[in-house]
Regions:
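Serine-esterase "nucleophile elbow" of acetyl-processing enzymes
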Residues: 11-74, 88-101
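Beta-sandwich interaction modules
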Residues: 2-6
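Acidic/histidine-rich helix-loop elements
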Residues: 46-51, 71-85, 111-118
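Intrinsic disorder/low-complexity detector
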Residues: 10-11, 111
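Alpha-helical cap/lid subdomain in secreted, periplasmic
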Residues: 58, 86-189
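Glycine-centered flexibility motif
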Residues: 1, 53-54, 76, 106
């Protein structure tokens, strides 16, 4: 993780364009502004190279200074590997009551096979850990179903490649009374 700029105690700023220019910059700590912690995989992570991009790196553009975003996502992560890599634990150390945790998993979880794996087994168990830990810190969990893959059938329509994972998340959101953003349905064309 040391190769990643977002995994240390430093603030990393990036200025883009043909002639980036900054005349002044003021950085002030604001503990009274809620933070949205983003947990997920490559569809959420701050992508390093263009033309790649994710909703996680774009979403802050739609909000003002009254909310902060902290993107803890990492390419290749599943819900259980995110926990095992201590990415959730790190986010929890920064979390305060009133914050939010948006979690989108399913792409890499769906690829895991074997005993105890599956949408209604290890996937839901891991998501329940996110929900419980988030609530224990006084923050608000929000489940986000996995965005559709760019996979089209012969008829030109999106192929559903996530199997039961979106349904498992929808079921868990209803059972645990957790808000759900159904990105899976929103990205179906």
């Amino acid at each position: 993780e040391k190769r990643k700029l977002n995994w240390d105690d430093k603030l990393t700023l990036e200025f883009n364009g043909k002639s980036p220019c900054v005349s002044e910059l003021t950085i002030e700590r604001t503990d009274n502004v809620p933070t949205v912690f983003l947990c997920g995989n490559s569809t959420v992570v701050d992508q390093d190279n263009e033309p790649w991009g994710s909703w996680g790196q774009m979403i802050p553009r739609f909000f003002n200074e009254n909310i902060c975003f902290a993107n803890y996502a990492e390419s290749g992560e599943s819900a259980n590997t995110f926990i095992a890599a201590k990415r959730l634990k790190k986010a929890l150390t920064q979390m305060k009551p009133g914050d939010y945790v948006f979690m989108e998993f399913g792409h890499n979880d769906q690829k895991q096979k074997g005993p105890g794996k599956g949408a209604f087994y290890s996937y839901m168990t891991s998501l329940k850990t996110f929900i419980d830990e988030t609530r224990a810190h006084g923050a608000h969990p929000v489940l986000v179903t996995p965005t559709q893959r760019h996979s089209f059938g012969a008829d030109g329509k999106i192929q559903d490649t996530h199997e039961d994972y979106p349904d498992a998340m929808r079921w868990l959101a209803a059972k645990e009374n957790v808000p759900l953003i159904d990105l899976n349905e929103m990205t179906r064309t």
